[in-house]
Each structure stands twice: as structure tokens, then as C-alpha cells.
């Protein structure tokens, strides 16, 4: 009998009922909620006279609608209603949650790991597609719909069909100036935005082992843009070190680690598909079009029109042409933030590139830490001063300009170098034009006034 993947091990440990190949009932170890997808779920509980079954396994925060300047002055009526409703619901149902402007408030996919709630071996769900971020810890984590949010609140379980297993091997060691954001953008560009559909993706290889936990989260975060619902990695010493000492880390930590060490893929585990990517010669990545698969290494020419891939529409929307390169993009905005790249390490890398330089004339740059703990840690290092002296706006935590659900929207027809995860039409605002890249690449673009090869600015 062949060995098991980490995904198989975790799935089997959490199945309550059902046969393989059919929907199976899974027990959920952590349910994270935010203000956008939880209101209808709580209302459903209220109307049915139900309670939250496991309040101790539920955790909430505010992120999508929160302003990042005057955080309590919410002008948009829908945003205000969602925030007020969330605050009312978590109080009424006695659910642990970060308060608006509170010490732990931040993007949902950041505060769960930062608080120590995200741990190896867990099943984690949230009404948000980028929940896969938590898979970097060796957890099965995935996004769910609003009706499923209600089901988990009421039962602490969810029905799911087990996906197939894919292994992706990141081979080699990257050059300086190449980051995990480049890994995942290159993977999506190579294999496409649908390559992961129907799979739980396990990321492996020497290049993954070398990454910090923050960098690993970036890759798992964008599993969704690869088409997969679930992305995860085998836990190791870096995982345990990250969790250790955090508020909600296991009390008997050594005992927990002894269990976690068994939650790795066996050497003879079988996969339904195996893909690979050599990162040793990888160059910085930038997207040119309107989905994350429309990305190229810096210096490559934009491709000829391929109607099967909607290139013509993408070129029209982005106001670009085949044969151009990323350096020809007329940037007007720089956004460093989002659940993909707003962690302390991301801000540190961007600040290193900036140094004592100033952003180019005509550019607007905003830096939005993903959580209050990250903001405070960055300020303790003086990173906020580096950004502000360079001409960036230093904001309060939130989802910010990743999506057009709060005041931080990119102006119409403006090109934005963004460290977020999606470059769809209108994602950052009406007719906004998004170019995905790493934080260091965004910082380099801010200084130069256009996309440049960040490797020329890396000093250590």
C-alpha cells in the first residue's frame, strides 16, 4: 500500500460521514469570519433560532470595508451597514472578534496566523476565497459561500467533495531580487489560471523549504488564481517557530509539535498530477493583462493577440499593445498591501529598495499594513518613516486598494503597480488598470516612475 499525502492524512482525520467520490461531511477546526459574507449567515441563525455551535472555534475581524485613513468616518452607507451589522452580530452571538480599530484588527487571512489560531493539521474555512493562505502551515484551508458560512456556524461541519491531488515542485534557488510572488505569478503564467481546478495543490521543493512562513503564505494565497480551492505545504521547523509563543498557540507546544511532525507527505505518496517550475533563472514577474495568467518576466515583449485567451479585450482595457514591454506602462499609482503581500517581511523588502530615495513625480503611492500588529512592528523599525519620507502615504490596516469596496480605489484608466492578487477589470476601481508584482518590484517602480528590473537595486 502506497503512502499518503499530507492532504489525504488531514482529510481522512476530519471526515465524519460520506463515501469517497461523494460529498463528505468534514469537521471544521477553525471558522474565520468577516463583515462581507457573514451578515446573511447570522440572520439565518437568528430566524431559525439557532446558536453558534462552537464559539471557541470561530473568530472574526473587519477588513474589506474598513477605511485606511479616517477609519471611523465611513462614508459609504453599504460599508457602514456591513461593519455595524458585523459588530452587532458577533456581540449578540458572543463570537470572539477583533473590534473596529482594535489591537488585533486586520485582514482576515493575516490575523488568524498572527494570533496563533492557524496551526498544522487543522481544517480552516472562511467566506473568502483566499482562505487557502492558511495552507502554508500544513492545514486544509479553503473559502466557502455564505450559505456554507451559516452551516458551519450552526454545525461546525461542511459537506465537500474531495478534490484530486496535485504536487508542484519549485526547483532550484532564486537569484537575489526574486521573491515568492514571482514564483506563483510565473507558475500561473506557465500553466494557466485553470490548471488547478479540481485539485488540492501541495507546494514542495528546495525553493519552498528556503522560504519564510510569510513568503509561503503568499504562494498559498494565490492558489485561487491558479484555479485551485486548496493550496498547502508540509510543516517544518519554520512553521513551528512561527506558531510558538503566539497567543492561541497550543499550551503543550512540544506535544503538539510531536503530532505535527507526522503530518507530512510520505515519500511514496501518490499524486494525480505533478508539475514543476525551475526558479533558478526566474526574472521579476509583472502582469500586463486582465487575469493573473497574463504575466511575463520583466523585459519580455507582450504577446501577439490570441482571441482564445481574450488577449484583444485585455489589450483594449489596459490600453497596451503586443510587442511592448512592462517598462512602457505609464504608471500612476503604487499599492503595497493586501492579504498577498502586506506582512512585515514584505514591507521590509520594499523599504530596502526605497532607502533614502523618493518616489517619482506624478506618482501616488500608498502602503497599507495588513494588520495592526504588522503596522506597529513596522513602525517600531522605522519603516513608516522610510515610506513617508519617500512620498508614500502610510495607512491604517485593511484590504484597501486590493478591491473596490472601500475608499482606496485606483482612479479610472490609471495604471497601478499592485502587490495584490487579482488584476481583473474593475477590481481596484472602475476602469482601473492593475499590474501584479512583488513588493520590491512595486517599490522599484515607484522610485523609477516605471517598471524596472528590481535586481539592479538589490544591495544585499
Swiss-Prot record:
Cofactor(s) demanded: [4Fe-4S] cluster
Binding site for [4Fe-4S] cluster: 339, 399, 402
Catalytic activity: (2R,3S)-3-isopropylmalate = (2S)-2-isopropylmalate
The keyword Heme belongs to this UniProt entry's keyword annotation: no
Protein origin, superkingdom: Bacteria
Keywords noted in UniProt: 4Fe-4S, Amino-acid biosynthesis, Branched-chain amino acid biosynthesis, Iron, Iron-sulfur, Leucine biosynthesis, Lyase, Metal-binding
Cofactor binding description: Binds 1 [4Fe-4S] cluster per subunit.
InterPro entries attached to this UniProt entry: 3-IsopropMal_deHydase_lsu (IPR004430), Acnase/IPM_dHydase_lsu_aba_1/3 (IPR015931), Acoase/IPM_deHydtase_lsu_aba (IPR001030), Aconitase_4Fe-4S_BS (IPR018136), Aconitase_4Fe-4S_dom (IPR036008), IPM_dehydratase_rel_enz (IPR050067), IPMI_cat (IPR033941)
EC number assigned by the record: 4.2.1.33
GO biological process: L-leucine biosynthetic process
Disulphide linkage map: none
Pfam families named in the record: Aconitase
Subunit relationships: Heterodimer of LeuC and LeuD.
UniProt-listed NCBIfam families: leuC, PRK05478.1, PRK12466.1
Function, as annotated: Catalyzes the isomerization between 2-isopropylmalate and 3-isopropylmalate, via the formation of 2-isopropylmaleate.
Name the record gives this protein: 3-isopropylmalate dehydratase large subunit
Species, as recorded: Lactococcus lactis subsp. lactis (strain IL1403) (Streptococcus lactis)
Upper lineage: Bacteria, Bacillati, Bacillota, Bacilli, Lactobacillales
Amino acid at each position: 500500500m502506497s503512502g499518503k499525502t499530507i492532504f489525504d492524512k488531514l482529510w481522512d482525520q476530519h471526515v465524519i460521514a460520506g463515501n469517497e467520490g461523494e460529498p463528505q461531511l468534514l469537521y471544521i477546526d477553525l471558522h474565520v469570519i468577516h463583515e462581507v459574507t457573514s451578515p446573511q449567515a447570522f440572520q439565518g441563525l437568528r430566524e431559525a433560532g439557532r446558536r453558534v455551535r462552537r464559539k471557541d472555534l470561530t473568530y472574526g475581524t473587519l477588513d474589506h470595508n474598513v477605511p485606511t485613513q479616517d477609519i471611523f468616518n465611513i462614508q459609504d452607507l453599504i460599508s457602514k451597514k456591513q461593519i455595524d451589522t458585523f459588530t452587532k452580530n458577533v456581540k449578540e452571538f458572543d463570537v470572539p472578534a477583533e473590534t473596529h480599530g482594535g489591537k488585533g484588527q486586520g485582514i482576515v487571512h493575516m490575523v488568524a496566523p498572527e494570533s496563533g489560531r492557524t496551526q498544522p493539521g487543522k481544517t480552516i474555512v472562511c467566506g473568502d476565497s483566499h482562505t487557502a493562505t492558511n495552507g502554508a502551515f500544513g492545514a486544509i484551508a479553503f473559502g466557502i459561500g455564505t450559505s456554507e458560512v451559516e452551516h458551519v456556524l450552526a454545525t461546525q461541519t461542511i459537506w465537500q467533495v474531495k478534490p484530486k491531488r496535485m504536487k508542484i515542485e519549485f526547483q532550484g534557488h532564486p537569484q537575489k531580487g526574486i521573491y515568492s510572488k514571482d514564483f506563483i505569478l510565473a507558475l500561473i503564467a506557465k500553466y494557466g489560471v485553470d490548471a488547478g481546478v479540481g485539485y488540492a495543490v501541495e507546494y514542495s521543493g528546495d525553493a519552498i523549504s528556503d522560504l519564510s512562513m510569510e513568503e509561503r503564505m503568499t504562494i498559498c494565497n494565490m492558489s485561487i488564481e491558479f484555479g485551485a480551492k486548496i493550496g498547502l505545504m508540509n510543516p517544518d521547523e519554520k512553521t513551528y517557530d512561527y506558531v510558538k509563543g503566539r497567543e492561541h498557540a497550543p499550551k503543550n507546544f512540544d506535544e503538539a509539535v510531536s503530532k505535527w511532525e507526522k503530518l507530512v507527505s510520505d515519500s511514496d505518496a501518490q499524486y494525480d498530477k505533478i508539475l514543476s517550475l525551475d526558479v533558478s533563472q526566474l526574472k521579476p514577474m509583472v502582469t500586463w493583462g486582465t487575469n493573473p495568467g497574463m504575466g511575463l518576466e520583466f523585459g519580455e515583449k507582450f504577446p501577439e493577440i490570441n482571441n482564445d485567451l481574450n488577449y484583444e479585450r485585455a489589450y483594449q482595457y489596459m490600453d497596451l499593445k503586443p510587442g511592448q514591454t512592462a517598462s512602457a506602462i505609464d504608471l500612476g499609482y503604487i499599492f503595497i498591501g493586501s492579504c498577498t503581500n502586506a506582512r512585515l517581511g514584505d514591507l521590509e523588502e520594499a523599504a530596502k529598495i526605497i532607502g533614502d530615495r523618493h518616489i517619482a513625480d506624478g506618482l501616488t503611492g500608498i502602503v497599507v499594513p495588513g494588520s495592526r500588529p504588522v503596522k506597529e512592528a513596522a513602525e517600531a523599525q522605522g519603516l513608516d518613516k522610510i515610506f513617508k519620507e519617500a512620498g508614500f502615504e502610510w495607512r491604517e490596516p485593511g484590504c484597501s486598494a486590493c478591491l473596490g469596496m472601500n475608499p482606496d480605489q485606483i482612479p479610472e484608466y490609471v495604471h497601478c503597480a499592485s502587490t495584490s492578487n487579482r488584476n481583473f477589470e474593475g477590481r481596484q476601481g472602475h476602469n482601473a488598470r492593475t499590474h501584479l508584482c512583488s513588493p520590491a518590484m512595486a517599490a522599484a517602480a515607484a522610485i523609477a516612475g516605471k517598471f524596472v528590473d528590481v535586481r539592479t537595486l538589490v544591495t544585499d
